[in-house]
Amino acid sequence: AYIPATYIRSEYQKLEMYKRIAGIENRDEWMDMQEELVDRFGDMPKAVQNLLNIVLLKSMAHQVYVEQVKQKKEKELEFTMFAQAKIKAEKIPPLLEKYKGRLQFSMKPTPIFTFIWSKEKQRGKDDSKNFFPNVIEFLQDMKEELV
């Protein structure tokens, strides 16, 4: 995920945009940045969209005390929480129920949520276009339910 030289030619402008993108803290700022980039530089290449998506995902994960996100299997992510995460433990069972069959929770020395991001039941079926929206929806639910 990067800003190609063909999208923003000026190194100074590119550096400024990297700084501003790194400062994104929520969905509103993420949407504003997308609009600004399109207004100033035209349609975003896939690499820039990926960069913005990664920054939003990291920001939202940080807000719910996630210290590490790791891909486990093809359509499975592991969210490792900070050991002292201030989450509402009583809200974990309803969250597990909401994502029944797609979410697991364990307390290996630190709290870990394992999330199957794809809603597709068929193995091998390409559901990659839904990766980002499904993960963001899950992080939003974590924020609303647990924090």
Locate predicted features:
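Accessory helical-bundle/CTD segments and flexible terminal tails appended to RecA-like ATPase motors
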Residues: 1-147
